[in-house]
Regions:
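Short glycine-rich substrate-engagement loop in P-loop NTPases that contacts/grips substrate
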Residues: 66-101
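Canonical AAA+ ATPase core
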Residues: 44, 53-56, 109-110, 115, ...
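Pre-Walker A (pre-P-loop) alpha-helix and adjacent loop at the N terminus of AAA/AAA+ ATPase modules
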Residues: 2-40
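Conserved AAA+ ATPase small/helical "lid" subdomain
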Residues: 222-305
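Walker A/P-loop
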Residues: 37-69
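Conserved nucleotide-binding/hydrolysis micro-motifs of P-loop NTPases
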Residues: 47-49, 61, 72-76, 108-111, ...
């Protein structure tokens, strides 16, 4: 559920930067320059700060369509499964239908090998590493403005009217890629450095997880294909929690608003302490729906035997 209709204070700088990059990319004045910038960008930040919602606002501001694919659900070319389409086919079809596209690859950090936290791009054992390699390869080719070898256009009347050369031009000139991720394992590693021994105190002098720190830990192949200046969102502030709760309440049906407001008042302090982000709203909505359901339920006859 997206409850943002305008950016929160902590999101404004990041949103403005995404919009500026996307508009400059679409303008195309860079194409004839001897040095071509890397426009595709990475957005990072803790869970629940509105990274994906930010992409939706950016798409609206730049008159772009929004295509979002979650990296863990990416289906590589050739991995045919009944009822599941290859992600490349979905992307090609979307591009064929739209003039401009902001393409969000969500949970990019899930594509990292287990050893990639150090920036080495090391590999992990097991079959999942093979899947990650295929998906990373396809994403790298898209970021380079190429389709994976052997790709076929969707068997669709509209797509049959556009050639592979035309859809490649659109990929290179009208598709702005945003890689989104929490990179939570790096935050966890940083926050849990301890000296040897049980019960040791946390190190009070840990480095801050800035955008530069995250960028320095990216596998080189990934870093080479995206803008080196990562866009980082900070944690939600207490005032942000209250604002998004108010915005969410206004969008709910009238019969749920009072119960939702009550749940927010019970949970918001714990949500702020635990840094749950907008996820705490889901808990409040679920409890409000449960309350409504219980209020409408027909009481059970105590004389019934089961």
């Amino acid at each position: 559920m997206s409850i943002l209709t305008s950016p929160l204070p902590h999101q404004k700088d990041a949103l403005n930067e995404i919009i500026a990059r996307a508009n400059a990319y679409y303008a195309g004045t860079w194409r004839n320059l001897p040095i071509r910038p890397r426009w595709h960008s990475l957005v990072c930040g803790p869970t629940g700060v509105g990274k994906t919602a930010l992409a939706m606002l950016a798409a609206e501001a730049t008159n772009s369509s929004l295509l979002r694919i979650s990296a863990p659900g990416w289906m590589p070319a050739g991995a045919h499964q009944r009822g599941t389409r290859e992600s490349i086919t979905v992307i090609a079809e979307h591009i064929a239908f739209h003039d401009r596209t902001i393409f969000v690859i969500d949970e990019m950090d899930k594509l990292m090998d287990s050893g990639a936290g150090s920036g080495s791009g090391g590999s992990s054992a097991g079959g999942s590493d093979s899947w990650r390699s295929y998906v990373r390869g396809e994403i790298y080719e898209l970021a380079d403005g190429r389709w994976p070898s052997g790709m076929r256009l969707p068997d669709d009347d509209h797509c049959n009217e556009i050639s592979l050369d035309e859809i490649t031009t659109k990929l290179r000139e009208s598709v702005f890629i945003l890689g989104v991720g929490t990179f939570q394992s790096w935050y966890d590693q940083t926050s849990s450095h301890r000296s040897m021994g049980f019960g040791a105190e946390l190190d009070p002098c840990l480095p801050e997880m800035t955008a530069d720190v995250v960028a320095s830990r990216l596998p080189r192949e990934l870093a080479n294909r995206f803008n080196s200046d990562l866009i980082k969102l900070p944690d939600l502030q207490p005032s942000d929690y209250r604002q998004i709760a108010l915005d969410a309440e206004r969008q709910l049906p009238a019969e749920l608003q009072e119960s939702f407001r009550s749940e927010v008042s019970k949970r918001i302090d714990r949500a702020i302490d635990a840094k749950k982000g907008v996820r705490f709203l889901e808990e409040c909505v679920m409890q409000a729906l449960k309350n409504a359901s219980m209020a409408q339920a027909v009481p059970c006859d105590p004389n019934l035997n089961f």
